[in-house]
Amino acid sequence: MQFKTIFATLAAFAAVASALPTSSSEQNGNGQCAVGQAQCCSQVQKQGKDASDALAGLGLAFNQILDGAIGLDCQQIPVGVLGGAIAIQNTCKNTAVCCQGSANNGLIQTSCTPLSIN
């Protein structure tokens, strides 16, 4: 009886742990985003005071908890570029990132991580 209780508890912990987000890269290893959309942003600010200052400079207050960096003035990177037909460096002269969300009608991209452009 005790074995069943211990096993059920361990199985529950394993299920919860596997559902939690990880801090691993959001890329699939070939310059494409596994999660979110590839964006080319004129500014990328790390989470914290820099991000808050950048938003305040735009006259915006952002009350959400930010996970990752924020991207400002971003454009989606075309699929042909992500497929390797055109080098990302030729299309994105600023910072390429993978972002999972957006706010203020797309003005701000949220939960961004750098996109490898090897």
Curated annotation (Swiss-Prot):
What Gene Ontology cellular component terms go with this record? extracellular region; fungal-type cell wall
GO MF term set: structural constituent of cell wall
Range of residues in the leader sequence? 1-19
Checking CDD domains in the record gives:
hydrophobin_I (cd23507)
Subcellular location per UniProt equals:
Secreted; Secreted, Cell wall
InterPro entries with a match to the protein in the record: Hydrophobin
Disulfide-bonded cysteines: C33-C98, C40-C92, C41-C74, C99-C112
What the entry lists under Pfam families is as follows: Hydrophobin (PF01185)
Q: What happens when the gene is disrupted?
A: Reduces the formation of aerial hyphae. Does not affect surface hydrophobicity.
Q: Which UniProt keywords apply?
A: Cell wall, Disulfide bond, Secreted, Signal
Functionally, this protein is described as follows: Aerial growth, conidiation, and dispersal of filamentous fungi in the environment rely upon a capability of their secreting small amphipathic proteins called hydrophobins (HPBs) with low sequence identity. Class I can self-assemble into an outermost layer of rodlet bundles on aerial cell surfaces, conferring cellular hydrophobicity that supports fungal growth, development and dispersal; whereas Class II form highly ordered films at water-air interfaces through intermolecular interactions but contribute nothing to the rodlet structure.
The record makes one more remark, namely: Filamentous ascomycetes and basidiomycetes generally contain multiple hydrophobin genes. In contrast, hydrophobin genes are absent in the genomes of the yeasts Cryptococcus neoformans, Saccharomyces cerevisiae, Schizosaccharomyces pombe, Kluyveromyces lactis and Yarrowia lipolytica, and the dimorphic fungus Candida albicans. These organisms have probably lost their hydrophobin genes during evolution. Mycosarcoma maydis does have hydrophobin genes but the encoded proteins have been functionally replaced, at least partially, by the repellents.
Family, as annotated: Belongs to the fungal hydrophobin family.
Its subunit composition reads: Self-assembles to form functional amyloid fibrils called rodlets. Self-assembly into fibrillar rodlets occurs spontaneously at hydrophobic:hydrophilic interfaces and the rodlets further associate laterally to form amphipathic monolayers.
User: What is the protein name given in its UniProt record?
Assistant: Class I hydrophobin hum2
Organism in which the protein naturally occurs: Mycosarcoma maydis (Corn smut fungus)
